[in-house]
Structures are given as structure tokens and as C-alpha cells.
């Protein structure tokens, strides 16, 4: 079977590296990270990938420049070998730069093609759709369609530990990517704007080598023809790879005491509370030792918010810039003035999206 992982723009290479580190051969094609194998490799990827958004089973690809062509493409796939006759079929679609741009119409045609194929197999007109779910995803770009099954259900960023809201949260998969890009694996880590704790917790999961999907379920576990044994084995494998780390190895701080308590609560849910030391302090009082500092400082779209954020960047310059001889620093922000306000040019800069906000990841290494 062929699968592919999706990732945020420009992070496909990071996702491919993660798969290779899991012992899975991967290649990047058309902004997707493809790999092949049996159910155990799908389970390993779902459980172990940190920066990917979703993982799919690739069903079929082909030309879809008309509704007839799309129907024939869908109908040609072996759906009766993939979807049970009681399976719930959900269709999602994305269309761009194509003749077929109506998402509802595309969804309708794809569902029609699948049902027609199942009708021919099972010789029945009505399907109850009251059993396991099959989430079919259709992407049409430049009149070419990719049809796949979403293996995850909830996106891979849903680790299960973050349940309390915080202002401008960083998605877990993005936080994991920031840590991977700067080369953090295990060692002292600092986050002076911890918010709800995402960067610190993702750092602790990585330091412990705890697979991020170890304690959640995936939609594909219930697919027809899939057994639970592969998932049991891969979860056992992941648990065996967990390592011990020094208590308080990671320091997470914030000027807002309520955010510090929220981060502590999330760390407890993630099972990494002992790895993180939480402090209530402003960034201007930061004083860390050797290690890595990765942070998502406040930023805003309104003038007042921007001015406040820029004052914070100057505080960072006072407290963090003198420590760069012993700290590797990574800062994600959409503000193109960051380097000037911080008072030093970055050694590397990478474009990254935080949700739909285009940011730069400034690295001082």
C-alpha cells in the first residue's frame, strides 16, 4: 500500500526526515511525503511523526478535467476491497486552478462513484453507513486529482494534552518542526514565552523520545482488513524507545502566572511534568545557561499590539542577546523588523507559516 503525509508549507523535508528516522523510506513529490508498506509502517508513522499534519492512504490519481472524468477515475478504484458495506463514507475536497472548482459538486460526484462501485459488488442499492468511518479526501489541482483515505481522524497535532485555550497558540506540529529545524534532540531547552506550554512540552516529548501519537487513537485502526496486532506491536516498540532524562532539563517561563499554570497543567497531561521547570518571570529577567532557546513571542496585527511586541523584542535584546555565545536561539515571528530590534542579524532564516500567518524563523546558531 502507498501512503503519504501532508505537512505545512516548506516543512515536507522535515516530515520526510522524521519518516527516515523511524526506519521508513520516504520521498517528497508534489508537496507530499510518500512511503509504501504494510499496516505496521502506517501505524509507526501515525504514532511517531511529530511535524506532519495528516497521513493518508493513497487510493488513485489521474486526470479530472470534467465531472465525467472524475467519476470514471473514482469508479476505477477497488472500493469494495477498501470500504466495508456498512462503512460511513465522508468526503472532503480541495480544488485549485482547475476546471472543477465547486467543492460540493466534487464531493457529490466522488461519493456517487464510490457508492456505484459498492452497489455493483454487493448487489444492494442502500448502504446503512452505520459502522467504521472512511474519510475520503480529494485534491484537484491543475485538473489532476489525488484521491486518498485520511488515516488519522483528528489531525496529528491533536496529541491529547492541550485542552485549555491560550492567546495565539502555536500548533503542536509547528512547535515540533521548529525544534527539529534548529537541531534540538535532548538537552537544556528554554522557552521564555511559554503560553500554554506547547514548545516546552514538545521539547520534552522529543527529549524523552516519547512518540507524540502514543496515547491517542486513529481512524484507520478500524478500517476493513486492518488488524489491531500491528498497532499493539508499534505502540510496544514506541514505549520501549522511551528514555530517561534529567529532571527539570527544560525551563518554561512567562510573565503571566495564569499561562504558567496552564502550561504546567498541559505538561502533567502529557506525562512530562518532571522534565520541565516552570517560572513566572518577564523575558527581561531571563538568565539561562548553555542549551537551546526556541520561542514564539507575542505579536499582533494592530498597531498597539505591534508596538507592544516590538518593546518585547528590545527586552529580548537586553537579556538574551548577551547569552548567544552559549545559547542557540530560534524565534518565530511575522515581524520583518525583528533582527533590527533584537540588534543582531540571524545566522539562518526560514519562512514558516503559523496557521495562516506567514512568519520567519530567525535562528542564531
Label each PLM-derived region with a short phrase.
Residues 1-132:
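Non-catalytic nucleic-acid substrate-recognition regions in nucleic-acid-modifying enzymes
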Residues 2, 6, 10, 247-249, ...:
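Conserved Class I SAM-dependent methyltransferase catalytic core
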Residues 96-99, 155, 298-302:
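A short, flexible beta-alpha/helix-coil linker loop
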Residues 136-152, 362:
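C-terminal edge-of-domain segments
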Residues 147-183:
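SAM-dependent Rossmann-like transferase core, predominantly class I methyltransferases
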Residues 170-287, 302, 306-308:
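Conserved S-adenosyl-L-methionine
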Residues 290-296:
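Short SAM/SAH-binding signature in class I
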Amino acid at each position: 500500500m502507498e501512503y503519504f503525509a501532508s505537512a505545512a508549507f516548506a516543512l515536507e523535508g522535515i516530515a520526510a526526515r522524521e519518516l527516515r528516522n523511524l526506519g521508513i523510506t520516504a520521498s517528497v513529490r508534489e508537496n507530499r511525503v510518500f512511503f509504501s508498506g504494510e499496516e505496521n509502517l502506517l501505524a509507526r508513522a501515525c504514532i511517531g511523526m511529530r511535524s506532519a499534519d495528516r497521513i493518508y492512504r493513497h487510493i488513485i490519481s489521474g486526470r479530472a478535467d470534467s465531472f465525467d472524468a472524475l467519476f470514471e477515475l473514482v469508479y476505477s478504484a477497488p472500493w469494495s476491497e477498501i470500504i466495508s458495506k456498512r462503512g460511513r463514507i465522508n468526503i472532503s475536497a480541495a480544488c485549485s486552478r482547475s476546471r472543477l472548482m465547486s467543492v460540493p459538486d466534487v464531493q457529490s460526484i466522488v461519493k456517487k462513484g464510490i457508492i456505484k462501485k459498492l452497489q455493483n459488488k454487493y448487489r444492494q442499492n442502500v448502504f446503512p453507513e452505520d459502522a467504521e468511518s472512511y474519510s475520503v479526501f480529494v485534491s484537484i489541482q491543475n485538473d489532476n486529482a489525488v484521491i486518498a483515505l485520511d488515516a488519522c481522524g483528528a489531525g496529528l497535532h491533536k496529541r491529547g494534552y492541550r485542552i485549555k485555550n491560550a492567546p495565539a497558540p502555536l500548533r503542536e506540529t509547528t512547535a515540533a518542526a521548529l525544534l527539529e529545524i534548529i537541531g534540538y534532540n535532548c538537552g537544556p531547552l528554554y522557552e521564555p514565552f511559554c503560553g500554554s506550554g506547547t514548545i516546552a512540552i514538545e521539547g520534552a516529548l522529543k527529549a524523552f523520545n516519547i512518540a507524540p501519537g502514543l496515547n491517542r487513537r486513529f481512524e484507520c485502526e478500524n478500517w476493513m482488513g486492518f488488524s489491531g496486532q500491528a498497532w499493539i506491536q508499534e505502540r510496544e516498540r514506541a514505549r520501549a524507545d522511551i528514555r530517561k532524562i534529567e529532571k527539570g532539563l527544560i525551563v518554561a517561563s512567562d510573565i503571566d502566572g495564569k499561562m504558567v499554570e496552564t502550561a504546567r497543567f498541559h505538561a502533567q497531561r502529557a506525562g512530562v511534568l518532571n522534565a520541565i521547570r516552570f517560572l513566572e518571570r518577564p523575558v527581561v529577567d531571563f538568565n539561562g545557561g548553555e542549551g537551546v532557546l526556541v520561542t514564539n513571542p507575542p505579536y499582533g496585527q494592530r498597531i498597539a499590539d505591534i508596538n507592544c511586541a516590538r518593546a518585547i523584542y528590545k527586552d529580548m535584546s537586553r537579556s538574551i542577546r548577551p547569552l548567544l555565545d552559549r545559547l542557540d536561539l530560534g524565534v518565530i515571528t511575522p515581524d520583518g523588523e525583528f533582527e533590527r530590534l533584537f540588534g543582531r542579524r540571524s545566522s539562518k532564516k526560514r519562512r514558516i507559516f503559523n496557521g495562516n500567518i506567514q512568519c520567519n524563523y530567525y535562528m542564531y546558531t
